[in-house]
Amino acid sequence: MNVYFILFLGVFAFIEVNCKSRKSKSLGTCPKLDVSTVCVVDYKFNCLFQKQCPSGYRCCTYGCNRRCAAVTVNKKHLGSCRNSSGKKGKRCKKDKSCKRHEKCCNKRCRRVRKKIAPVRTLSKNSSNSFSFLMKLISINR
């Protein structure tokens, strides 16, 4: 079991270094989120690669998890006021007064996207290391 854990850490470290070298400023920066730092593997939300995240989201590290988090791109908040939902938020004049997943719509911050997005399923060719890692994690349970 310790061998699998060490192997897991090695693979994770390789991915982390590999991903950091490919980061683009156009993707925005990872926001600080109030998300659990408990190490739980949730196949729907844990990402390993940026290409698993939808447009406007970035694969960010939170504790020992990696999630597709909403980001601003070139300081612009993505989304449309037509898609806004939720209760009226705080008063605003511009998007920069709102959180990254909100826009200033009718002088109120409104949620236009989710803070955390589900990951996209990768094609078989691009997900070999992801599948291997998930199988490895399953073995250790």
Swiss-Prot record:
Protein name, as recorded: Perlwapin-like protein
Places the protein is found: Secreted
Example of a GO MF term: peptidase inhibitor activity
Signal peptide start-end: 1-19
Superkingdom: Eukaryota
A GO CC annotation given for this chain: extracellular region
Tissue-level expression: Component of the organic matrix of calcified shell layers like nacre and prisms.
InterPro entries (alphabetical): Elafin-like_sf (IPR036645), WAP_dom (IPR008197)
Organism: Mytilus galloprovincialis
Gene3D superfamilies, alphabetized: Elafin-like
Keyword line: Disulfide bond, Secreted, Signal
Disulphide bond pairs: 30-60, 39-64, 47-59, 53-68, 81-105, 92-104
Pfam family, one: WAP
Domain WAP: start-end pairs: 23-71
